[in-house]
């Protein structure tokens, strides 16, 4: 990868073998976005497409009526200078003046990666993996600087963030500060977003961009199940394999805002960053503020190409630590099998049964701590319930491990119950208005993580449970969103900082704990996939994808999640039937087929399984272990879309290309059966592949071009799985 600067024409060119990103300095002041896309050798600097004398446009350079900021393709636009589209940043001084004039004031080209302070980001293992461009914008009147950071890698990705520095003598308030802005010259795109609801996360929405705007956002305190900080721009007709795709994703776990805004002259503006709603940051003299990092991915190979870039980047350069490259264990979670009805005897019986089936990790979910028999009490009091565990938690963990199985535990550290010792001792640690009774959700309140004392308490409380070393896994949950925004810790002028400071506090807590316990596998959760984002993956390398364990619903949820996140980050469980969320009954084989497309787990009462079902589960687990490396670290391809069809299908190709796992799920059986033809992807067309079960041989070109015909099965929710070996 390289970054060049052409002095005469003031052109920056970031490029590698796959992509180019071009920026030009206009009028010695303004940054113009020129190009982001397939690699080009040079940019013709004479292009002046947007220089016209247009009526009703402001002219910042009085003698040039052809130049207006409202018509230009901008890189990081301000407000108040005649560009009436959405700005990337805004401020307000102590006199209420919101005007600012940041102009270009220099650059640096650096080897390696510059990281945003205190925030998750794409990292590098060596400086040779990346190059970074730092561009300085300065308001000399206010004595303020904004540094724009662009990092390019070997893959088709660029990361961006911005840093605001107050060099003046007076404080200012940052009212809006986005991570990225990019203006594009045409509106000929489809827009792809991932939205949904609790237990219906990451639904795929695609629509043509018209002469209006598309906005995505969360103001819930987290990235949320209702929205995802992602925007995809697709050239018309783009498919999984073909077409241009520009994908933008934010590495952040809090409130976010994104938009695709249509301009009056056929251009568009793409933005992503912290949601300016209820946001403000007091920037004192001599201090700075960093935005979260945005990831920009470009693909000429359709949606699959975009996903593969995100998958490689997030698995190897966002996920970190001991488990980054290690296979994840097959687990049994106690929640749907027992709910709050747990004790030492039941857990030991469960451990023995689980070990006999080949399960490697027993996770004790909610209900283990002092007085926790319902969801109305005890959050915050992270000590074991002596009535349920008279010999203590560590004794239980040791006994479980003696049965040949690891032990994990559930926490919800960010929450507090009114009926708890912690609340009685520290009622001021709760996020709430000083005027009103706080609103409950799931009978619980949210701890104020902007307060360092709260963060230290959480680190200490979780550490006391983990220090003895018998617990190898933590499920970190968050089962409500933020309301009644108010902090007893923050000053009045800093109250609008609360939502962002909450996220910064959370990141600091997780950074400390994951460094302190590097061999504990942390899995994040927020009532399922309510905080499934790249920010959380920086600290916890896998996420519980959804609280909805129905395999038919999971087809869509996991399909949508796969646009950004690799299979090894997705928790997926086989649960009981009828399903506890929707009441549907589905075959055990199909439940396994869907769950086996992620980190496999089981979430049911093993005692209720019939003898033949236990035999089937034992065989499932053995089969998954045989192919686990391929599932978790292979390249994933979507083949059929259950949002559009009565089926879903995918295949995964191992890292070395020697193994292929193909899965097809029929949703509803039909009398007038249409034989599905599914074309596999990512194979070697010149190779021969052998079906490991039947011995049948296929050509790679046959599987990819002619495809596989799925025979008729007269049963709803049926599945077919084929494991192929390359000869």
List PLM regions with ranges.
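Aromatic-lined carbohydrate-binding/catalytic grooves of carbohydrate-active enzymes
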Residues: 323-460, 473
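Carbohydrate-binding surface patches
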Residues: 231, 642-684
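Short Pro-Gly-centered flexible turn/kink motifs
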Residues: 97-104, 281-300, 718-725
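Glycan-recognition surfaces
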Residues: 417, 422-456, 500-607
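Glycine-rich, aromatic-flanked loop segments that form ligand/cofactor-binding clefts
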Residues: 70, 75, 80-113, 240-254, ...
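Polysaccharide-binding surfaces and accessory modules of carbohydrate-active proteins
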Residues: 5, 9-13, 17, 31-261, ...
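C-terminal beta-sandwich/jelly-roll accessory domains of carbohydrate-active enzymes
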Residues: 668-727
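Conserved, mostly hydrophobic/aromatic
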Residues: 18, 162, 286, 332, ...
């Amino acid at each position: 990868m390289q970054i060049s600067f052409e002095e005469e024409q003031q052109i920056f060119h970031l490029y590698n073998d796959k992509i180019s990103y071009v920026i030009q300095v206009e009028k010695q002041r303004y940054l113009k976005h020129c190009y982001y896309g397939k690699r080009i050798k040079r940019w013709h600097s004479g292009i002046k497409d947007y220089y016209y004398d247009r009526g009703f446009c402001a002219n910042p350079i009085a003698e040039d009526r052809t130049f207006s900021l409202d018509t230009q393709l901008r890189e990081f636009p301000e407000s108040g200078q005649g560009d009436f589209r959405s700005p990337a940043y805004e401020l307000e001084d102590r006199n209420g003046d919101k005007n600012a004039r940041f102009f270009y004031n220099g650059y640096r080209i650096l080897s390696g990666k510059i990281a945003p302070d205190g925030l998750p980001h794409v990292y590098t293992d060596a400086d040779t993996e990346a190059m970074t461009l730092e561009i300085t914008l300065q308001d000399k009147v206010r004595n303020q600087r904004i540094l724009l950071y662009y990092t390019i890698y070997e893959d088709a990705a660029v990361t961006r963030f911005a840093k605001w520095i107050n060099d003046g003598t007076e404080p200012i308030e940052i009212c809006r500060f986005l991570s990225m802005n990019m203006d594009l010259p045409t509106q000929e795109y489809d827009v792809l977003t991932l939205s949904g609801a609790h237990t219906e996360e990451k639904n795929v929405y695609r629509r043509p961009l018209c002469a209006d705007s598309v906005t995505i956002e969360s103001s819930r305190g987290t990235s949320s199940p209702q929205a995802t900080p992602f925007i995809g721009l697709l050239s018309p007709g783009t498919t999984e394999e073909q077409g241009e795709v520009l994908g933008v994703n934010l590495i952040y776990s809090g409130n976010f805002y994104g938009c695709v805004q249509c301009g009056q002259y056929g251009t568009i503006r793409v933005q992503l960053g912290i949601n300016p709603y209820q946001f403000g940051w007091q920037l004192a003299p001599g201090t700075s503020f960093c935005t979260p990092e945005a990831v920009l991915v470009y693909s000429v190979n359709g949606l699959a190409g975009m996903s593969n870039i995100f998958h490689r980047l997030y698995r190897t350069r966002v996920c970190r630590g001991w488990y980054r490259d290690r296979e994840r264990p097959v687990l049994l979670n106690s929640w749907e099998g027992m709910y709050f009805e747990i004790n030492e005897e039941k857990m030991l019986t469960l451990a023995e049964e689980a070990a006999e089936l080949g399960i490697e990790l027993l996770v004790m979910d909610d209900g283990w701590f002092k007085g926790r028999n319902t969801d109305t009490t005890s959050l915050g009091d992270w000590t074991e319930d002596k009535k349920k565990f008279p010999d203590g938690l560590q004794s239980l963990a040791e006994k479980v491990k003696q049965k040949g199985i690891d032990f994990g535990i559930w926490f919800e550290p960010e929450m507090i119950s009114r009926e708890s010792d912690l609340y009685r001792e520290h009622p001021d640690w709760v996020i709430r208005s000083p005027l009103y009774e706080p609103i409950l959700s799931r009978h619980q309140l949210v701890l104020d993580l902007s307060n360092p004392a709260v963060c230290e308490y959480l680190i200490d409380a979780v550490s006391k449970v983990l220090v003895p070393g018998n617990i190898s896994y933590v499920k970190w949950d968050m089962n409500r969103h933020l309301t009644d925004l108010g902090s007893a810790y923050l000053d009045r002028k800093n109250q609008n900082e609360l939502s962002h400071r909450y996220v910064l506090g959370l990141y600091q807590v997780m950074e400390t704990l994951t460094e302190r316990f590097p061999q504990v596998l942390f899995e994040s959760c927020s009532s399922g996939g309510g905080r499934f984002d790249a920010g959380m993956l920086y600290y916890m390398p896998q996420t519980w994808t959804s609280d909805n364990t129905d395999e038919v619903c999971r087809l869509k949820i996991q399909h949508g999640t796969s646009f950004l996140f690799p299979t090894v980050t997705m928790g997926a469980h086989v649960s009981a039937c009828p399903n506890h969320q929707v009441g549907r009954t589905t075959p055990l084989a199909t439940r396994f087929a869907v769950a086996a497309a992620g980190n496999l787990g089981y979430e049911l009462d093993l005692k209720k399984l019939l003898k033949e079902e236990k035999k089937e589960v034992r065989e499932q687990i053995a089969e998954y272990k045989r192919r686990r490396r391929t599932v978790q670290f292979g390249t994933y391809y979507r083949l059929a879309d259950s949002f559009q069809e009565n089926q879903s299908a995918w295949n995964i190709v191992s890292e070395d290309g020697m193994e292929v796992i193909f899965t097809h799920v029929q949703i509803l059986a039909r009398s007038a059966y249409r034989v599905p033809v599914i074309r596999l992807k990512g194979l070697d067309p010149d190779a021969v592949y052998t079906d490991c079960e039947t011995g049948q041989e296929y050509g790679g070109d046959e599987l990819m071009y002619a495809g596989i015909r799925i025979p008729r099965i007269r049963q709803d929710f049926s599945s077919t799985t084929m494991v192929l070996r390359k000869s």
